[in-house]
């Protein structure tokens, strides 16, 4: 998981939760074509979109980062 690119992680978590691209688009307010482009790596999501995707997948945005931390509070410190 740590070696996966963001586009691979978006697809992985979406499939793990058995969500279609259309449903993820509805949950996030991001156009379904944009979700598709993120998943195949044509576009990279900006931080705001990544947060919306994380919320739509019901995960922490930290899941998309290739870093290891003890907890989210460590990001602020």
Predicted regions and their residues:
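Short amphipathic helical patch at the helix-1/turn junction of helix-turn-helix
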Residues: 4, 15-16, 44
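Conserved hydrophobic/aromatic packing and binding residues within compact polymer-binding modules
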Residues: 10, 24, 35-38, 64
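Recognition helix of helix-turn-helix/homeodomain-like DNA-binding domains
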Residues: 29-44
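DNA major-groove recognition helix of helix-turn-helix/homeodomain DNA-binding modules
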Residues: 48-63
């Amino acid at each position: 998981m740590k070696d996966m690119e963001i586009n691979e992680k978006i697809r992985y978590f979406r499939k793990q939760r058995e969500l279609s691209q259309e449903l993820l688009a509805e949950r996030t307010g991001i156009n379904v074509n944009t979700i598709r482009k993120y998943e195949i790596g044509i576009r990279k999501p900006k931080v705001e979109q990544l947060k919306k995707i994380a919320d739509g997948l019901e995960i922490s945005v930290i899941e998309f980062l290739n870093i290891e931390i003890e907890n989210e509070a460590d990001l602020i410190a």
